[in-house]
Amino acid sequence: MRGAEVTDMRPSRGPFTGLLKKILFRQSIKHPRLQPLWGRLHTLSVYGMNYGGGGLIGTSGEAWALVNVVRRVCGNVAAPVVFDVGANVGDYSLLVRRHLPLATVYAFEPARSVYAELAKRVSAGGGRGGPFNLGFSDSQKTVDLYSYTVGGQEVSLISSIDLRLPTQAVEVKTRASERVRVETIDRFCEAEGVARIDFLKLDVEGHELSVLRGARRMLDEGRVSVLQFEFGPANIYSRTYFYDFWSLLAGGYDIFRIIPDGVVPIPFYGEHLEVFLTTNYLAVGKRTP
C-alpha cells in the first residue's frame, strides 16, 4: 500500500532498547505494589492503540481508512464494486457512496426488520447493487438469527454465538430469533456475475471468519482487493481468534489495524494481538497496485 499514513510495529533497535529490556527483566519491577501502576498503564496503552474504539464509524478510523486507503486503492477502477456485509441500516453504504460516487454498492442485511429500513435508505444504482435481505456464512443454509439489546442498541448474532455475556456492565435482553437464509460470497458472486470485489467490508458480530471462509475462492484467486473486518468481544462467543484471520489472510494480504487517523501495519503474528475489544482491521491485497 502506497502513501497511507502508517506506524511501523517492528521493535526499534538501539541502546535504549537494550536498557529497557534489562529494566523490564528485573524481578523488582514485578513487585506487587507496582501492579496497580502497570494495570493503569496497560489500560492506557490499550486505549491509545484504539483497541475498543472500533464501534462508531466517525471516530473509529473507518471513515479515514475509506477515504485515504480504500479510495486510493480503487482509484484506477472506473466503477468499483463494494460489498457491505452486515450493513444494518446503511450508514456505511451511504458513506461509501459519498466518497466513491461511481461505486456499485451491494448492501447485505439478513434481519428483516432492519433490512426494511436499509431498503428505504439504500437503493440500487444502475440496475446492479443495492440492498439484499441476505446474510453470508461458510455454506448455504438457513440459520437462527438472534436479536438482543445491549445498552439500548440492537445487535444481531448468528445462533452459534453464545449470548450469555460475562459482564455486569450492561443489561442484555435477548429477543426472539428469526430464521434467515445465508449464502456464501463465492456462490453469490458466481450467480450474480460479480467477477471482482474491490472492497469487502464485514461487520457481522463474530461471524466474520465464517463469511471469509465462504469467500475462499475469491480470496485465493486475488479477486478481493481490500477487505475490512471487525474483531472484538463477539469473537469470544464464536470461539474465533485473530490467529484464524491471520492464517487465512496473511499469505495474500498485508494486514493493518485501523486507528482514528491512520493504519498500523501488523507485519507478524503474536499472542499480544488477541485483544477482544472492538477493533477494525484492514487487509490490502499484496497483488493490489
What do the PLM-derived regions correspond to, one by one?
Residues 2-289:
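Phosphate/nucleotide-binding beta-alpha loop and adjacent structural elements of enzyme active sites
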